Amino acid sequence: MSSSYYVNALFSKYTAGASLFQNAEPTSCSFASNSQRSGYGPGAGAFASSMPGLYNVNSTIYQSPFSSGYSLGSDAYNLHCSSFDQNIPVLCNDLTKPSCEKAEERQPAQPGRGQFRIYPWMRSSGPDRKRGRQTYTRYQTLELEKEFHFNRYLTRRRRIEYAHALCLTERQIKIWFQNRRMKWKKEHKEESSSTPAPNESRQQQRLWRKWKKMKKRRIRESHSRKQSLEITYARDSCKSSL
């Protein structure tokens, strides 16, 4: 046997194994069943053209290990790869959708300059800002009136006790007593200038009568003094004329 026989036999085994490995490797679906690997160089194309039976998809050498046992041909592999290639972008889109939505939820839209929230403490307190009038309940007013009847001025300790008991602040109780004292002074000032009312107590009526009697007595005394002075002056004038 010549050396060329051994070389051809080895070359045929190598090329057949390479072709099977090339078709079985699922590296990329873009490679056809009869495509050439770029790593074999230009010589591989020459050998492949010289032996078309080994590289042909329809040849018996290629179909014997797969088609006999599994009844699968090149079309089945090509269809599987094409369907897988078509589903790749769909799967990628489905996988990236929730991540993109989560990223959008985590990054809320930044408000513009005119959309900032203004809190009450950020607003300026100008002269037009009016404070609401404090309204007291009937129970609070009754308790404060009772205390005012006995004490017109409250101490700090008593004010704190009433603030806790009536659910008010010390400032509110202080203002209420100030207003109540002014009202009381105004009422008593009007009473002193006018006659006593008939519905007042007997003691006040007695005091009023005594004051009237004293006033009349003083008027009488003043008149009597005046008359006595006039009489004495007349007597003196008569004596001087004589």
Swiss-Prot record:
Residues 207-220 have a biased composition (Basic residues). Residues 187-227 are annotated as: Disordered. It is found in: Nucleus. GO terms for biological process: anterior/posterior pattern specification. Residues 129-188 bind DNA. Central nervous system including forebrain. This is Homeobox protein Hox-A7. The gene is HOXA7.
